[in-house]
Amino acid sequence: MKFSVYRYNPEVDETPSMQDVEVEVPEGRDLMVLDLLELAKAQDPTLTFRRSCREGVCGSDGVNMNGMNGLACITPVSDVARRGKLVIRPLPGMPVIRDLVVDMGQFFKQYEKVKPYLINDEAPPAQERLQSPEERARLDGLYECILCACCSTACPSYWWNPDKFVGPAGLLQAYRFLADSRDTATDERLAALEDPFSVFRCRGIMNCVSVCPKKLNPTQAIGEIRTMLLQRGT
């Protein structure tokens, strides 16, 4: 099979380029995109990409495949190849360190802004802080984020303002703790989100929903935060 992969080594290359690669695919097998990259790397060890778990858990191998962000390890080639063509690029909107490896620093800075951890100023209980089944169920679809950055790097608002806009991944986690019955920092969290580059920078394009490998819905979470902010102001 032939495919094209983005190549760029800032130590030696003046500009990025696309490299055509041909690998031998076992007959009758639908490989994952990561398998193609591994086969290509066996031919050219200088090809650089991130990967770890191979099961869609670690979130380290996010790439852009024929214009769609996703995890290479759980994306079948047949899902993204079009007329036998496949182009693999790094996640868009982030500085490239080398080939398919991007600098995630800005992404994690935005994530850190929302304080993605439980805040509770009450005296610690003798045992764990309990939740009812209904309270626990409110967190489903919020806590499963694996920080792969596929959503934020598919978002035009994030492309335009990566140093200001929190992005869908961060805002999903902001709502995850706003929705947590054990968290006591609701006012503090909402006050921090009253910012023109927070939830109201989202344009509802829903690219984030389309590319999330965990089938989460950051757009819905952002809408919930907007509702809370509006109710807080009345």
Where are these regions (language model features)?
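Short, contiguous acidic and Ser/Thr-rich linear segments
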Residues: 18-31
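Short, structured protein-protein interaction patches enriched in aromatics and acidic/basic residues
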Residues: 53-62
